Swiss-Prot record:
Key word Lipid metabolism present: no
Function recorded in the entry: E2 conjugating enzyme responsible for the E2-like covalent binding of phosphatidylethanolamine to the C-terminal Gly of ATG8. This step is required for the membrane association of ATG8. The formation of the ATG8-phosphatidylethanolamine conjugate is essential for autophagy and for the cytoplasm to vacuole transport (Cvt).
Biological processes per GO annotation: autophagy; protein transport
Similarity remark: Belongs to the ATG3 family.
Pfam families membership: Autophagy_act_C
Name of the protein: Autophagy-related protein 3
This protein's record includes keyword Transport: yes
GO MF terms held by the record: ubiquitin-like protein transferase activity
Residue stretches of biased makeup (Basic and acidic residues): 114-123
Region (Disordered): 103-125
Organism for this UniProt entry: Arabidopsis thaliana (Mouse-ear cress)
Protein origin, superkingdom: Eukaryota
Length: 313
């Protein structure tokens, strides 16, 4: 951790200790949440997405302003099938990256495009119009194919004398070589990782905060530095930091919340301009949707099929 980050965390911790949590809603005005709104949004996420659950965490680290059994949200064993760098070109080709906030070159990607791998394969598929289908190539009917009604041509197994029909020198029985299956080169195997994702309430920034705990294919804990391989290169080392988890032991990679409120405010403004009145209990669905641009290959559940809010039209 660099000195500036250490100083900021020390300052942030001091402010959190001497100030109380937000109690007045500023969801639409600032894109932030009060503690009660965070719990409300968390309850809705758990209800709509059963893979998410509330956790109490380490008793010594519990925050008094949160319910003891609802200290943070977590979803476990989330698959990550490939590294973030492998899809960067796909996103660019799909033209799906849109900066929600690009002030001071600190923008966030609102969404991302779809991979184009399948499209390439489809380009190589022949058209049905190009196939020359004629009557001569059609499959014969079953009776004709197997000899029709001419049963007399089919030999009777009872006519075979086993002693006279044994082939003693069948080449197939003398085959001395056989095929051996070899494992592919390890360098060509894409290792599937899994992640535990947790969401905490950041009292200083008054927004949710995502934390990542990664595991390799053998369920061995990933070093936080390796987690960066599964973070969009636009955000790795810039908006993703390695810090102490507020409720769990050890260092964890985390998406820093310094811009969360501003980004959420812009998303809310866009929805309202389209005649949709966002509801605060849907906050985490929107939040996790824009988080997908930071960790595009970690396939967590945030339920795309949901009502963003009540339409004013």
């Amino acid at each position: 951790m660099v000195l500036s980050q250490k100083l900021h965390e020390a300052f942030k911790g001091t402010v959190e200790r001497i100030t109380g949590p937000r109690t007045i809603s500023a969801f639409k005005e600032k894109g932030v949440l009060s503690v009660s709104e965070f719990v409300l949004a968390g309850d809705n996420l758990v209800s709509k997405c059963p893979t998410w659950s509330w956790e109490s965490g380490d008793a010594s680290k519990r925050k008094p302003y949160l319910p003891s059994d609802k200290q943070f949200l977590i979803t476990r064993n989330v698959p990550c099938l490939r590294r973030a760098a492998s899809v960067a070109e796909d996103y660019e080709a799909a033209g799906g990256e849109v900066l929600v906030d690009d002030e001071d070159n600190d923008g966030w990607l609102a969404t991302h495009g779809k991979p184009k791998d399948k499209g390439k394969e489809e380009d190589n598929l022949p058209s049905m119009d190009a196939l020359d289908i004629n009557e001569k190539n059609t499959i014969q009917s079953i009776p004709t194919y197997f000899g029709g009604e001419e049963d007399d041509d089919i030999p009777d197994m009872e006519e075979f004398d086993e002693a006279d029909n044994v082939v003693e020198n069948d080449p197939a029985t003398l085959q001395s070589t056989y095929l051996v299956a070899h494992e592919p080169d390890d360098d060509n195997i894409l290792r599937t990782r899994t992640y535990d994702l947790s969401i905490t309430y950041d009292k200083y920034y008054q927004t949710p905060r995502v934390w990542l705990t990664g595991y390799d294919e053998s369920r061995m804990l990933l070093q936080p530095e390796l987690v960066m391989e599964d973070v969009s290169q636009d955000h790795a080392r810039k908006t993703v930091t390695i810090e102490d988890h507020p409720h769990l032991p050890g260092k964890h990679a985390s998406v820093h919340p310094c811009r969360h409120g501003a980004v959420m405010k812009k998303i809310i403004d866009v929805l309202m301009s389209r005649g949709v009145e966002p509801e605060v209990d849907k906050y985490l669905f929107l939040f996790l949707k824009f988080m997908a641009s930071v960790i595009p290959t970690i396939e967590y559940d945030y339920t795309m099929d949901f009502d963003l809010g009540s339409s004013s039209t």
